Amino acid sequence: MKIQVKNKQNNSKMCFICGMENEYGLKASFFELEDDHLAGTFKPCKFHQGYPGRLHGGIASAILDEAMGRSILIEDENVWGVTIELNVKYKKPVPLNEEIMVICNLTNVGSRLFEAEGKIMLPNGEAAVIATGKYIKLSLKKITEEEFIDDQWFKVEHMDDPKEFNVPEKASR
């Protein structure tokens, strides 16, 4: 199912997941979709390896945590999710050197907490890693310094950014 992108989220300079200047990071990009899912793309390489040719499980967990924590930005761009619980199930290995998609959505939103679920999807449409998480809502200003927001939190748009995502039916539920 093709779902249109409605907004690209910001990146930072040095975050391991989304940092554009972190030479060992994933340099992931995240997109808000019209159906209120959050999709992300990344291409793991040799620096992200666990077993030969496979993404390290801790890094798979980290990108799911990042994506689920960001999913609240769809509802409120001034709120960030700080992890209080993360559950991850590994189903299939995630290959290196291929464009990989992560997709997540909010499952419960309260006044102080929210919950989300996410999946790392293989190029063939299968879910490789699935996760659920619980997060506390905090303003970015409470998490970091004002200088970070001004100097290191920015939107990076590219000509080849996707305008839509082909989300497998299994991923959107």
Where are these regions (language model features)?
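HotDog/MaoC-like acyl-thioester-processing domains
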Residues: 1-7, 95-96, 107-173
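Hydrophobic residues positioned within well-ordered beta-strands of beta-sheet architectures
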Residues: 40, 84-86, 102, 116, ...
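Catalytic strand-loop segment that frames the active site of acyl-thioester-processing enzymes
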Residues: 13, 17-55, 170-172
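Hydrophobic beta-strand-centered segment that forms part of the acyl-chain substrate-binding groove
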Residues: 67-101, 107
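Active-site region of the double-stranded beta-helix
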Residues: 58
